[in-house]
Amino acid sequence: MQYGTKLAEGKTKIIYAHPEDQSLAYMVQKDSISAGDGARRNEIDGKGAISGRTSANVFALLNRSGVRTHYQSDPEPGVMLVERCEMLPLEVVMRRLATGSYCRRHPETPEGTRFSPPLVEFFYKDDANHDPQIYLEGIVEKGLATAEEVSFIEQEGTRVFELLEQTWAERGVQLVDLKIEFGRTADGSLIVADMIDNDSWRLWPDGDKSKMLDKQIYRNLQTVTEEALQNLKAKYEEVRDITESFR
């Protein structure tokens, strides 16, 4: 496949311009997995194709459900054709159950506490400072978004979470939490962008944390071995296969 100019490169993907249509771009997934703001990093052969297909399946569901996203198509494994947009340097996290970093920040909250509606949190993308939590006032002061746009992001994020939560529930899996990102299009609209794959959420089959299918398995490893990475790859393949039914 022919790509245009490289526009950006991150820990797990490379963005290329479309060679003919400047309103589009190609998002190419790497075989990398990382944690701890990149402090831990490994390669898993084939992960890029697995993650790319998972994300394409999720975005296809969102598009069909009326959520505006950057996704156009997935022309080959690990590659998504997307609408170009300027990414907001924000991670938007929706939580149904308290776990992970939330419980570390709020030790008074028991793990498994249910949030209804889902709790929405914002984190400023800054690896050097470990993606600090940011609130409405800080988002507006930094000029990242207006108060009205933050409200829209909260509503749209909740909509995306509840749609995916229901879809996973129909397959016997609890969607515990979800991280998404938004981009600003040429006309100023905010759309769901980046990736939504097995690095983006926590999935507990039957609501059982011990059966987790997601990236938390990698974060929890005391020692990274080739066997552990292959077991993790099998979980990612399982999630990809389940999401095929999202289309």
From Swiss-Prot:
Gene3D superfamilies: ATP-grasp fold, B domain, Phosphorylase Kinase, domain 1. One of its GO terms (molecular function) is ATP binding. PROSITE patterns: SAICAR_SYNTHETASE_2 (PS01058). Keywords: ATP-binding, Ligase, Nucleotide-binding, Purine biosynthesis. GO terms for biological process: 'de novo' IMP biosynthetic process. It catalyses: 5-amino-1-(5-phospho-D-ribosyl)imidazole-4-carboxylate + L-aspartate + ATP = (2S)-2-[5-amino-1-(5-phospho-beta-D-ribosyl)imidazole-4-carboxamido]succinate + ADP + phosphate + 2 H(+). The keyword Ligase applies. InterPro entries: SAICAR_synt/ADE2_N (IPR028923), SAICAR_synthetase (IPR050089), SAICAR_synthetase_CS (IPR018236). The keyword Ligase applies. Pathway: Purine metabolism; IMP biosynthesis via de novo pathway; 5-amino-1-(5-phospho-D-ribosyl)imidazole-4-carboxamide from 5-amino-1-(5-phospho-D-ribosyl)imidazole-4-carboxylate: step 1/2. Its EC number is 6.3.2.6. Pfam families: SAICAR_synt. Disulfide bonds: none annotated. Belongs to the SAICAR synthetase family. This is Phosphoribosylaminoimidazole-succinocarboxamide synthase. It comes from Herpetosiphon aurantiacus (strain ATCC 23779 / DSM 785 / 114-95). The lineage of its organism: Bacteria, Bacillati, Chloroflexota, Chloroflexia, Herpetosiphonales. The gene is purC.
